[in-house]
Amino acid sequence: MDTKAFKRSLQQSENYHRKGFGQEDEAMGVMNSEYQSSLIQEIRNNNYRLTQGDVTIRLAEAFGFCWGVERAVAMSYETRQHFPNQRIWLTNEVIHNPSVNQRLRDMKVEFIPVIEDQKDFSVVERDDVVILPAFGASVTEMQLLNDKGCTIVDTTCPWVAKVWNSVEKHKKRNYTSIIHGKYKHEETVATSSFAGTYLVVLNMEQAKYVCNYILNGGDKQEFLAKFKKAYSEGFDPDTDLERVGIANQTTMLKSETEEIGKLFEHTMLKKYGPLDLNNHFMSFNTICDATQERQDAMLDLVKEKLDLMVVIGGFNSSNTTHLQEISIHHGIVSYHIDSAARIDLNNHIEHKPLGKDLEVKENWLPDGKIVVGVTSGASTPDIVVEQVLQKIFAIKSAVAMV
């Protein structure tokens, strides 16, 4: 289908809203009172460091709520204010942060139920309001909601929409979209729905496999089995990898996205030569500024002399996971938690090691003076970071008094 024409038609509908309802200041005031932190602002003003007792905190210089997340949450608050008596639904978590999503539930914003891995949109009625989250929604979902005639509030991050425009350009020129991302992630599901032919690659290892296939061929059935559920219907690696364009899930590791883009460019250059490269490869510029800033800040932070790192964000948050990867790659003991509730005052922490299930670590804060690096994902409010720091200070203070 012509997804570009559908988007244009949807945006002209009187039931579609993507710019709020004129109550932005009120919504932001409520948000600021709930999510901002005077302590975190104090640390920012003090060159991103604070020493209290035996603990020195080193904050990353870019962390926490990004503009797209702040916008999505503010629009959700504003929607509740503007429609105080109507039933409001979210098609997914508005962002990947448990406390923010719980706050919306407390405001009687409901989530579309999921039955056997499928969303049940039958619960939505014409008079209802449906919020599309920061990650966006698939074309199919938007069509369904538009057909129902309900009110649609679109909080999709503009950076995500920029990626949609890129894959639509690929489709228009008959290029296959190579999407660096997680094929099940809400954002990638939405992005792939705007693409024509596409293939989702998770990492450099998968990208190298694809590029080797482009140059040398291989077992098609093995290829299709390896990327099961990660390609468009009818995808054929023997014919659909002759012309490719690169796109990405905006929260992926910036350096890896760039490396994957260069790998595909070099692969097509090797196969088709410099004079014909532009007929087989489309370059890209879809790396989110906020993701890049947070990853760059983390790369600066790991250069400090740290005893350990605390990474705060939802366990299903892709951008938070990549911050954790950077810390581990640089040999720093790192703990990924989603809230201060994961820390108890007996010096235990329940955390999620990279690629593993939750586990509990006892005596995670060492004795004596320590320097703790701290960062948080783009969906984590400052107040959550403060709550984590207060737990750390309390544990070390109690130990010092023994």
Curated annotation (Swiss-Prot):
Task: Tell me the residue numbers annotated for binding [4Fe-4S] cluster.
Answer: C66, C157, C288
- Residues holding isopentenyl diphosphate: H96, H185, S317, S318, N319, S379
| Amino-acid positions noted as binding (2E)-4-hydroxy-3-methylbut-2-enyl diphosphate in the UniProt annotation, renumbered to this chain | H96, H185, T250, S317, S318, N319, S379
- EC supergroup of this enzyme: oxidoreductase
Q: Does the keyword Oxidoreductase apply?
A: yes
Q: Which UniProt keywords apply?
A: 4Fe-4S, Iron, Iron-sulfur, Isoprene biosynthesis, Metal-binding, Oxidoreductase
- Chemical reaction(s) catalysed: isopentenyl diphosphate + 2 oxidized [2Fe-2S]-[ferredoxin] + H2O = (2E)-4-hydroxy-3-methylbut-2-enyl diphosphate + 2 reduced [2Fe-2S]-[ferredoxin] + 2 H(+); dimethylallyl diphosphate + 2 oxidized [2Fe-2S]-[ferredoxin] + H2O = (2E)-4-hydroxy-3-methylbut-2-enyl diphosphate + 2 reduced [2Fe-2S]-[ferredoxin] + 2 H(+)
Please verify whether the record's keywords include Metal-binding: yes
List the active site. Answer: E187
Pfam families named among the record's database cross-references: LYTB (PF02401)
> Quick one: a GO biological-process term for this protein?
isopentenyl diphosphate biosynthetic process, methylerythritol 4-phosphate pathway
What does the entry's cofactor note say about binding and number?
Binds 1 [4Fe-4S] cluster per subunit.
**EC number, UniProt record:** 1.17.7.4
Q: Which residues does dimethylallyl diphosphate bind?
A: H96, H185, S317, S318, N319, S379
Pathway assignment reads: Isoprenoid biosynthesis; dimethylallyl diphosphate biosynthesis; dimethylallyl diphosphate from (2E)-4-hydroxy-3-methylbutenyl diphosphate: step 1/1; Isoprenoid biosynthesis; isopentenyl diphosphate biosynthesis via DXP pathway; isopentenyl diphosphate from 1-deoxy-D-xylulose 5-phosphate: step 6/6
Q: Which cofactor does it need?
A: [4Fe-4S] cluster
InterPro entries linked to this entry: LytB/IspH
Recorded GO molecular functions are:
4 iron, 4 sulfur cluster binding; 4-hydroxy-3-methylbut-2-enyl diphosphate reductase activity; metal ion binding
In UniProt terms, what function does this protein have? Catalyzes the conversion of 1-hydroxy-2-methyl-2-(E)-butenyl 4-diphosphate (HMBPP) into a mixture of isopentenyl diphosphate (IPP) and dimethylallyl diphosphate (DMAPP). Acts in the terminal step of the DOXP/MEP pathway for isoprenoid precursor biosynthesis.
Q: Which family does it belong to?
A: Belongs to the IspH family.
Name of the protein described by the UniProt record: 4-hydroxy-3-methylbut-2-enyl diphosphate reductase
Name the source organism. Gloeothece citriformis (strain PCC 7424) (Cyanothece sp. (strain PCC 7424))
Q: Taxonomically, what lineage is the organism?
A: Bacteria, Bacillati, Cyanobacteriota, Cyanophyceae, Oscillatoriophycideae
As recorded in Swiss-Prot or TrEMBL, the protein's gene is named ispH
